[in-house]
Amino acid sequence: MALVVKDIVKNFGEGLSETKVLKGINFEVEQGEFVILNGASGSGKTTLLTILGGLLSQTSGTVLYNDAPLFDKQHRPSDLRLEDIGFIFQSSHLVPYLKVIEQLTLVGQEAGMTKQQSSTRAIQLLKNIGLEDRLNVYPHQLSGGEKQRVAIMRAFMNNPKIILADEPTASLDADRATKVVEMIRQQIKEQQMIGIMITHDRRLFEYADRVIELEDGKITD
C-alpha cells in the first residue's frame, strides 16, 4: 500500500488576491516508509500536511491511498476510518484534567476498543517510552518532554495506517528531539505505517528514509 499525492494545487483567495500556496505536488510514500518534509517558512509544508490529513481540501489534484481516493466527496476517508490517520503537533495538547493513562485509553475507547483492550494497549505504549510509573499523574506534573512523548503515543494508540507530524520536536532540546524522532520512526517501522513529518532540524534528517524539500509551493530536485 502507498500514499500517492498527484498534482496537488492549493490556492487561497480569489481574483487579484489569489495566492498559490501549492503548485502541483507529486510524490509517493510506501507502507513502512518514514519521510521528512523540509522547507522554509511559507513553502507550503503545513498546508500540504493539513490536506493529507483531511483538515483542508485542495483546489485540484488527488490523494490516493491503496489506489483509491483518500477522501470521498464529503471529505471523509473513503478507504480508512478517521482513526486510521494519526496526528502529532508541536504542542502536546493533553487534556489537563485527565491522567496520563486516560489520555490514551479515551482515544482507544472512542475508536471501539473495550476498556480492557484500551488499558492494555495504553500501558504497553507508555511502558515503551519509560512512563509506566507515571500512569496516574496529570499533565501539569510532567516535563515538556514527557508531555510530548505521551502525545506521540496517543497518536499511535489506534494503530493508524498514516502518521502525520508537524514539527513535533520544535520545543525540545537536541537530545530529547532525537529520542522523540527515534520513537516515531520505530513505531512506523514496527507497525508498517506511512509516516510523514515536518521538521526544520537537519540533524534529524538521518532518521528519515527520504527527505522531500519544498520551495515556493513546489518540490525541488
UniProtKB/Swiss-Prot annotation:
It is a peripheral membrane protein. Keywords: ATP-binding, Cell membrane, Membrane, Nucleotide-binding, Translocase, Transport. It holds the Pfam family ABC_tran. The keyword Translocase applies. Induction: Highly induced by hemin. One of its GO terms (molecular function) is ATP hydrolysis activity. Residues 3-221 form the ABC transporter domain. Gene3D superfamilies: P-loop containing nucleotide triphosphate hydrolases. GO terms for cellular component: plasma membrane. It is an enzyme of class 7 (translocase). Its EC number is 7.6.2.-. ATP binds at residues 39-46. It is found in: Cell membrane. The complex is composed of two ATP-binding proteins (HrtA), two transmembrane proteins (HrtB) and a solute-binding protein. Belongs to the ABC transporter superfamily. HrtA family. Part of the ABC transporter complex hrt involved in hemin import. Responsible for energy coupling to the transport system. This is Putative hemin import ATP-binding protein HrtA.
